Swiss-Prot record:
Species the sequence originates in: Xenopus laevis
Name of this protein: Nuclear transcription factor Y subunit beta
Compartments (UniProt record): Nucleus
Subunit structure comment from the entry: Heterotrimeric transcription factor composed of three components, NF-YA, NF-YB and NF-YC. NF-YB and NF-YC must interact and dimerize for NF-YA association and DNA binding.
GO CC annotation terms, alphabetical: CCAAT-binding factor complex
Amino acid sequence: VQECVSEFISFITSEASERCHQEKRKTINGEDILFAMSTLGFDSYVEPLKLYLQKFREAMKGEKGIGGTVTTGDGLGEDLAEEPFTSQIPAGLITTDGQQQNVMVYTTSYQQISGVQQIQFS
């Protein structure tokens, strides 16, 4: 299962990275991931994820605290109330467009956002 998940993430990330490259950007954002999912045939997940992303950004908006920033798709930084990253997982090397990059994956848990249902993958 882990191999399949890794391949899926690489598949989506590669498509999102290609879009960023075409638009001469270096950072993949949520909209790039959603675009990639739609392009690759995962349309049924795009709308619920758009809603979740919107609700997540609304929940993060206005929280203030440690001085860290979150960059949203509109390019605006937002202050965070708490340290958002609770652990780091070294992800090794991911190949995108023929180049290898060192990547650090940050994980955390957030409260359930009201009005958003969890997505069940099957």
